[in-house]
């Protein structure tokens, strides 16, 4: 599995701001969206393009456009929604598919409660978005749902991840690419990332 820890200075600066404990909901949302936008730029650098001819201001001109059915964004509810606008800023024509999962706080395993995928999934590149890749359980479940639709080109975009989760995904799905702003140290006894960002869902939605 290809794992890209994106070390761009803008990403690292904004991630540092995200780690501050006293951010307002508005500030956290804005920064999460900005980092998602930059990760999208990295994750789409290998998309295929094709030549088309359009009418330019001085006559016909040949330009490049992304080839095929393009992209579906797959936010994992609920925290993944906090990254969605940033991705859509870069790919405004992308279709949005949704996966609803919550974590059982005793077993730390994901429980699925909702899924809705766009059409022609087998022809699309899926960009899974979620602020955290912790145990890897939610991502694993989402990948399996996507592959059940026929989707085979899958990438994940995360603000932070830990080696434990990355190893789980690498073992089960070596064909999936991961783009992450930071590979953090470890999980604590409650399954939260350290140093991490805290509870990203609560920070994005202003809940506790």
UniProtKB/Swiss-Prot annotation:
Taxonomic lineage: Bacteria, Pseudomonadati, Thermodesulfobacteriota, Desulfuromonadia, Geobacterales
Known function: Catalyzes the conversion of uracil and 5-phospho-alpha-D-ribose 1-diphosphate (PRPP) to UMP and diphosphate.
Cofactor comment: Binds 1 Mg(2+) ion per subunit. The magnesium is bound as Mg-PRPP.
SS bonds (residue pairs): none
Keyword Nucleotidyltransferase in record: no
Binding site for 5-phospho-alpha-D-ribose 1-diphosphate: 78, 103, 130-138, 199
Entry's family note: Belongs to the UPRTase family.
A Pfam short name: UPRTase
Keywords: Allosteric enzyme, Glycosyltransferase, GTP-binding, Magnesium, Nucleotide-binding, Transferase
Cited SUPFAM superfamilies: PRTase-like
Annotated uracil binding sites: 193, 198-200
Taxonomic superkingdom: Bacteria
InterPro entries membership: PRibTrfase_dom (IPR000836), PRTase-like (IPR029057), Upp_B (IPR034332), UPRTase/APRTase (IPR050054), Ura_phspho_trans (IPR005765)
GO BP annotations, alphabetical order: UMP salvage; uracil salvage
Pathway(s) the chain acts in: Pyrimidine metabolism; UMP biosynthesis via salvage pathway; UMP from uracil: step 1/1
EC assignment: 2.4.2.9
Swiss-Prot/TrEMBL cofactor(s): Mg(2+)
Activity regulation details: Allosterically activated by GTP.
Molecular function, one GO term: uracil phosphoribosyltransferase activity
Catalytic reaction equation(s): UMP + diphosphate = 5-phospho-alpha-D-ribose 1-diphosphate + uracil
Designated name of the protein: Uracil phosphoribosyltransferase
